[in-house]
Swiss-Prot record:
Name this protein carries in UniProt: Cell division topological specificity factor
InterPro entries the UniProt entry points to: MinE, MinE_sf
Source domain of life: Bacteria
Family: Belongs to the MinE family.
Gene name of the record: minE
Organism placement in taxonomy: Bacteria, Pseudomonadati, Thermodesulfobacteriota, Syntrophia, Syntrophales
Keyword Repeat: no
Organism per entry: Syntrophus aciditrophicus (strain SB)
Gene3D superfamilies for this protein: Cell division topological specificity factor MinE
GO biological process, one term: cell division
Length: 93
């Protein structure tokens, strides 16, 4: 393994970690007295998140789980994407 290969592998791990952290971000929107139409952006946000992931990683719809929950005054959008490891096995991120 050359030094360039090593540095590239570090970059990939760093990029993967950053992507994973970004996807694990829970979008919470406080709805104190706000109308329901203020949450209309959530489906568009979901689509854009998936488009960004698909730009860098090949994933099928079956590898993606999206959950929208209401917790009190908050709406929580959770996105989980199963990514293949080096051996091609999938695990939920």
């Amino acid at each position: 393994m050359s030094i360039l290969d090593y540095l590239r592998s570090l970059q990939k791990r760093r990029s993967a970690s950053i992507a994973k952290e970004r996807l694990q971000i829970i979008v919470a929107h406080e709805r104190n007295g706000l109308s329901r139409r203020t949450l209309d952006f959530l489906p568009l946000l979901q689509k854009e998140l998936l488009d960004v992931v698909r730009k860098y990683v090949e994933v099928s719809d079956s590898q993606i789980k999206v959950n929208l929950e209401k917790n009190g005054n908050y709406e929580v959008l959770e996105v989980n994407i199963a990514l293949a490891d080096a051996e091609g096995r999938f695990s939920m991120s």
